[in-house]
């Protein structure tokens, strides 16, 4: 398992090339990476400067499996897979909290966009014992950084009709850029 991402430098270069070709530019690296992975033409995807960090191993036939997640990461790295060099093993809750606080402060200096930190139980046996609920593991939790915010003005409130005929209020906003995405409307609940 792993996560495909688009480094910020590659994102800027890709957008420069797209603009020069008269194509629409991507809003942000995360959306560009997600769209690239879903791209129906693999030749287009192959031309994009995507990268990947591996964070898990399902099963390796004929080999004794590591007992911990941290050992798994070392094993995968020894095979030549790219592992995030910022991974760390925290032995206490306080160490995990300090790790989160450190990266919350440094997130804008990372070569890729990050929206939080994932904390996992290191023991694979304990991970197995805890299991998952649906696709959500009970042995890992994502601590998200505070959301990027923007300020704008409410121009008006309109009403849209939902697919079941319900009337839904919608805020019409002065456009504001938040995380590289221009927001013009917002659902009101």
Language-model-derived ranges and their functions:
Residues 1-189:
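RNA/tRNA-interacting regions in translation and RNA-turnover enzymes
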